[in-house]
Every structure is written in C-alpha cells, then in structure tokens.
Design a protein with these regions (language model features):
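Extracellular jelly-roll beta-sandwich "head" domains, especially the C-terminal globular C1q domain
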Residues: 1-143
C-alpha cells in the first residue's frame, strides 16, 4: 500500500517502515443510559504478529458521556485524540476501546459507537461514520 501501512482483517494496520508515528482519531460515541459512563480508548501494538497485542503506555484517553437526554435521545460525544508511538517494520497497531457499561444501538443501555447513514430529510448530509483516523509518519528512529 502506498500509505506505508497494510490494513489487516482484525482491524489493525501493519507498518512497512520502522519509525515514529502519530495516530489521530475521532470516535463517535453515544450513551442511551440514565447514568454517566466513560469510554476508554487506547493503542495496542504487537511484535510482528497481530494475534498478541500489547497496550501502549500512556496512550489511554477517557471520554465521559453524560446521561441520555430522554428515552429517545442519547447523549453524544465525538472523542478526538492524537498519540505518538514507535513501530518497527512488520509490527501492527490497533485502536481499542472499552466502557463500564457497553450497549448496542437500539439494544441494552450504555455506551456504543454511533454511525448514521446519509440523510435526505429534513436536510441532506453525508453519512456519519463511527470512527475516522489517520496514521502519519513523523520521523525515523534516532541512530
């Protein structure tokens, strides 16, 4: 891939070049519960096998979602963060998240990642993805 990464079936990306990288992400969370909950997001990397990922120290960001506004209107948060990290060629990185109260859209109450198809009414706008992100090469490792 021309981007310097190969996307993997397990939602990780494998670096083609050793270096220092910056991941930037935006995650759309919803809370349909009557209580405040946290969404906790962090990076995991591996040593060339995407089957055993290790947590990246100091990569965690906590997003607090207030209680829902009403039974039909969840509380939304667009969580944004940037993390600088090191990868060797052949290593993979993935973005992970967890919460104290997981839910599904239209299912149990709690936190879930929110996506919305393109809309035409009452006004037209494109789809709202649950996650956006990019990985940027910052520099080679110091010699």
């Amino acid at each position: 891939a021309g981007s310097g990464f190969t996307l993997n079936a397990n939602n990780t990306a494998t670096a083609q070049v050793t270096g220092i990288y910056k991941i930037t992400y935006s995650l759309q969370f919803a809370n349909n519960d009557n209580a405040i909950h946290n969404a906790i997001v962090w990076l995991r990397v591996d040593g060339s096998s995407a089957t055993s990922l290790n947590d990246v120290p100091n990569s965690t960001t906590i997003f607090t979602l207030q209680a829902r506004k009403s039974a039909l209107l969840p509380n939304f948060v667009c969580g944004y963060s940037e993390v600088v990290f090191t990868l060797n060629a052949g290593e993979s990185v993935g973005l992970w998240w967890g919460t104290d109260q997981a839910a599904t859209s239209g299912g149990a109450t709690g936190i879930y990642m929110y996506a919305l198809a393109a809309q035409t009414s009452p006004m037209a706008y494109p789809a709202t993805p649950s996650a956006l992100g990019s990985i940027t090469f910052v520099s080679a490792l110091p010699s």
